[in-house]
Amino acid sequence: MKRKLIAAMETCGFKEGQTLLLHGTLNPEAAYPDTFATFWTDDVPDGVHFDNVTGSYDWAFSVIIYSNDPKIVNTKKDEVRAALKAAGFIPQGKGQDAPSDEQTHTGWAMDFVITEYLI
């Protein structure tokens, strides 16, 4: 499911390892890219069960967009939400402001769930 999330984010212009990063992996010594996104797997609980066998997993992801241009944050979030929704991810609301470690950047965080069916 991470690969699916990454592929959907790449349709929005993010590049894995450059402007799309696992949350917490940005080099603290490096300058922030002008615009970038991070993601994190929040949880992957069992979904359904049948005869003591797990039939699905519900993947929960957080995606955070950061930019030094607030206009980009305010428009890119809609593009990302639409791309992830088209890829099968279910938005959990519209999101919320996200703090940044750099005063030059603002952020927007969104949560998504997608079910992985095993049977």
Regions found by a protein language model. Name each.
Residues 52-53, 67-73, 92-98:
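Short C-terminal domain-edge/linker segments immediately following a structured domain
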Residues 1-50, 71:
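Small/polar-rich, solvent-exposed N-terminal microdomains that initiate assembly or binding
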Residues 47-48, 57-59, 81, 95-97:
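Short secondary-structure boundary micro-motifs
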Residues 50-55, 101-103:
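Short, solvent-exposed beta-strand/turn "edge" segments of beta-rich domains on protein surfaces
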Residues 40-43, 56-60, 82-86, 112-113:
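Short, low-complexity, polar/charged sequence segments that are solvent-exposed and flexible
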